[in-house]
């Protein structure tokens, strides 16, 4: 899933990446995946090579120098030794083949530069760790990557910071021009990726991107206020209003900047939920035909609302803020429209991999919406919703029964938080990959 995620987002930045680093987006993605494989699978792979070499060594005439030399060459004994007993599995340049400038921009020295006060960095243990923006550490002039989880979780934003830093050093573009181009490419790439994923989940659906509708009434006029919808999906008797938010989640320490984090939630989830709700409200006002327009006021779609039975409001974020998005409607500091489903592109990729029937996916969305409307249950992870659905495909009803049974014995519960409900989903993925 990581390769698909990065390819979706970085493909639109290919020209900019080539201008700054002289490489393609696919070279960047291949390097990240090679690092992932080396850190996660490298030890097991090299041990298998070592076992094969040992077995062949036992069958070889050890007094024959030529045979022993051929054996060392065949299995690359030096490479095995470096990976087993050295740091070869974590050597960024050797594994990725990236240019030195990119590796440098993503690396942090192991110690402060000479002349700095103190022998160690001053790091707040409960704050933002430097590794988030610098996934590599430089030791003895070489860059190493040791943490797979941080690399995959934060690489996209760390790469953006590296690109921006290198652009400033080389003065390739003005800072304003670089940021503007990146954001435009990012919006296009993320919306295109989300539309494609919904097209795979709901094959044959009508998918309309960047369409407009009147804010009030049902008649569109270029002289009256209108609102843009990122994606509208029509499948059978269902309509999905999807808003995509590519903005970065707040990069500051939540202990020092709680207001910044609240503002980020409002921008990424609250605003998107209201935009999606406005689209659904417009469609429901129309009787029976609802039209969607391009920016010039030309009708691009007509939806027969008399045949629509289910409407979904969905917010999709580029950044994974799962632990909050999964229960966004329960957060006291943002005002999310009731029934809104807030997910990340990561979650959508998981849905796309798991669901092979569009009707089952739509049934899951109905249960997911019901859970978000439930005032007394909350989840800490979007995949807990999917895990509960796999265990019981009417999980909101099951939870109600559990609450009623518990309350009949012990009294009223204000809120029940579910966590770690992904065992069956984990088993499914383990069986496929």
Model-derived features: positions:
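Extended, hydrophobic alpha-helical segments in both membrane/secreted and soluble proteins
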Residues: 194, 227-231, 242
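Acidic, metal-dependent phosphodiester-chemistry machinery of nucleic-acid enzymes
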Residues: 1-188, 192-205, 214, 218-222, ...
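Active-site-proximal structural scaffolding
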Residues: 187, 191, 224-225, 235, ...
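Catalytic cores of nucleic-acid endonucleases
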Residues: 246-301
